[in-house]
Curated annotation (Swiss-Prot):
Protein name in the entry: Quinolinate synthase
Source organism of the structure: Mycobacterium leprae (strain TN)
Cofactor: [4Fe-4S] cluster
GO cellular component, one term: cytosol
Gene behind the chain: nadA
UniProt xrefs under SUPFAM superfamilies: NadA-like (SSF142754)
Positions contributing to [4Fe-4S] cluster binding: 117, 204, 303
Major location category of this protein: cytoplasm
Enzyme class: transferase
Length: 352
């Protein structure tokens, strides 16, 4: 096992570079993601026997240097499969926790442990326990965008692409408590038609901020475009309304996870696509299909927590071996069961 201890010697004049890193509440600054930085990151990664994973919403420089880029669940499964015993997870904290849950014997690092998630924080273990007490016997279905403690109290996890399948796998007569995303939960209720699905009123502040008016305006201004909408978006209902009212062709309105967006982008015949999700996703979409004009429905939809994983944070992480992610063994075992139950029903799909 590769153990990350202490300061690792730096190449060339990178000592000066790391000395210039400044800390602030919004992340580690002072380092440019240039070729010198990239060369040093690759060297340190090899030296430490590490694999760097980056979420689709990360800064372009972080995505470019990563060994793998994807959604949180796909990356966590990769973490469990790769031979390297040190995982550097460039994402928000619950994602690194999920990687640790699925790889309990590996060292998992996150470049900045302060990178939280408004959606994961929207339900606490105590709140979930109280909700379960109000609905004895109900099945708890939790989105993978939850903390380890919430996963441990969950019967079965789901992703944005398989949430409907997961809920439909549960006895129709049994109540379902769906948490924490209200918009994904509303999507599940709408598609399944189940009235006994109760939805927690949590949200991702970035996706919730992509509103229906913006989407309607963009759709009407670009009648020749296809529309990709993430189910966490507050505008997902507006997208379906546009299709239902005939204002936008139904076959051009797609409610998709980030992984689903990449697949659809590679297969579409349209040359313009409006995208309703965190703006970091456009970088991966443009790489996957450079001939398509991808446009953000809201170009201000940027997650400040995702962007805390800066070039300086990643360099610091590999030099100092920080910040390591720990999950209590009993919580990890219970959380792992809820994820495995999801995988066992098939179609695990994309994490977000």
């Amino acid at each position: 096992m590769t153990v990350l201890n202490g300061m690792e010697p730096l190449a060339g004049d990178m000592t000066v570079v790391i000395a210039g890193i400044t800390d602030s509440p919004v992340g580690y600054a002072g380092v440019d993601g240039d070729e010198q930085w990239a060369t040093e990151i690759r060297r340190l990664t090899r030296l430490r026997g590490a694999t760097v994973l980056a979420h689709n919403y990360q800064l372009p420089a972080i995505q470019d240097i990563a060994d793998y880029v994807g959604d949180s669940l796909a990356l966590s499964r990769i973490a469990a499969e790769v031979p390297e015993e040190t995982i550097v997870f460039c994402g928000v904290h619950f994602m690194a926790e999920t990687a640790k849950i699925l790889s309990p014997n590996k060292t998992v690092l996150i470049p900045d442990q302060r990178a939280g998630c408004s959606l994961a924080d929207s339900i606490t273990p105590d709140e979930l326990c109280a909700w379960k007490d109000e609905h004895p016997g109900a099945a708890v279905v939790s989105y993978v965008n939850t903390t380890a403690e919430v996963k441990a109290l969950t019967d079965i996890c789901c992703t944005s692409s398989n949430a409907v399948d997961v809920v439909e796998s549960i006895d129709p007569s049994r109540e379902v408590l769906f948490c924490p995303d209200q918009f994904l939960g509303a999507h599940v209720r709408r598609v399944t038609g189940r009235k006994n699905v109760y939805v927690w009123m949590g949200e991702c502040h970035v996706h919730a901020g992509i509103n229906g008016d913006e989407l309607v305006d963009q759709a009407r201004a670009n009648p020749d475009a296809e529309l990709f909408v993430h189910p966490e978006c507050g505008c997902s209902t507006s997208a379906l309304y546009l299709a239902g009212e005939g204002a936008f062709p139904p076959d051009r309105v797609k409610i998709l996870s980030t992984g689903g967006m990449l697949t659809a982008a590679r297969q579409t015949q349209y040359r313009k696509i409006l995208v309703a999700t965190e703006v970091g996703m456009l970088y991966q979409l443009r790489r996957a299909a450079p001939e398509i004009d991808f446009r953000a429905v809201n170009d201000r939809a940027s997650c400040k927590y995702m962007k805390m994983i800066t070039p300086g944070a990643l360099l610091r992480c590999l030099v100092e071996g920080t910040d390591e992610v720990h999950v209590d063994s009993e919580i990890a075992a219970a959380g792992r069961r809820s994820v495995q139950r999801m995988i066992e029903i098939g179609l695990p799909g994309g994490g977000e």
